[in-house]
């Protein structure tokens, strides 16, 4: 979405590219699976210098929740440089890549709220790259903790442990604050902090400090999402 020459992102770019790729292959009667679509869109993004984790692409492949683990970027780059045929690149295994649906049993409601803030993921990525070499130890600590917490969150969602889900969300938020402490990448605005404080758990969405803030609470119903596009 655009307003006053400012771009507001809602993860829509990944969804649009996934839809276009599926539509073209369907029109051409070419069979495909979700991994093929993900790889095609990712290669397009990399070719056009579109930065990011590609998590929005993975999340757009299926309805519901998705577990996504990013591929090893340097190893993928080696594959791209060593192969001329795009089919060979797509058919090659991408080290580290995992995309699979999550089937939550936990009765949790996510309250997603639009902040009205503008955030540019590319600028955050650029800022991080400028600082990463100076904080390699801290970054390794952050990534290790994040991976463990995500695995714990998936297990809690699928086992139906609502309390552990909320506790893990808060730990993920704390870990993001740790990243903020040495990366100079702002994670939350004051309005986001106040919104999160009114719920048992919460965190920013995306690269931080903009677009969407997420709050979590136990629910009497099944796992669900409530999106509020009224400006925070």
Stretch-by-stretch model annotation:
Residues 1-6, 27-31, 39-51, 57-207, ...:
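C-terminal nucleotide
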Residues 8-30:
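DPxDG-like acidic metal-binding loop motif
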Residues 11, 15-16, 54, 208-212:
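Gly/Ser/Thr-rich beta-alpha loop segments that engage phosphate groups in nucleotides
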């Amino acid at each position: 979405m655009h307003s006053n020459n400012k771009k507001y992102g809602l993860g829509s770019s990944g969804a649009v590219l996934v839809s276009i790729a599926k539509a073209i292959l369907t029109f051409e009667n070419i069979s495909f699976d979700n991994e093929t679509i993900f790889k095609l869109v990712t290669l397009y993004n990399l070719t056009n210098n579109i930065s990011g984790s590609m998590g929005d692409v993975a999340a757009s492949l299926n309805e519901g929740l998705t577990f996504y683990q990013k591929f090893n970027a340097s190893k993928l780059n080696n594959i791209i440089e060593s192969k001329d045929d795009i089919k060979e690149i797509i058919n090659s295994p991408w080290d580290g890549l995992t995309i699979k649906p999550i089937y939550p049993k936990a009765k949790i409601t996510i309250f997603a709220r639009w902040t009205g803030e503008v955030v540019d993921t590319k600028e955050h990525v650029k800022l991080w790259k400028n600082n990463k070499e100076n904080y390699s130890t801290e970054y390794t600590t952050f990534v290790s903790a994040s991976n463990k917490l995500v695995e714990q969150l998936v297990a809690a969602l699928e086992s139906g442990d609502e309390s552990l889900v909320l506790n893990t969300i808060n730990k993920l938020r704390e870990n993001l604050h740790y990243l903020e402490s040495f990366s100079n990448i702002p994670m939350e605005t004051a309005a986001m902090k106040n919104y999160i404080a009114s719920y048992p758990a919460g965190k920013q969405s995306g690269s931080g400090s903009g677009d969407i803030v997420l709050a979590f609470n136990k629910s009497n119903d099944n796992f669900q999402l409530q999106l509020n596009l009224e400006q925070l």
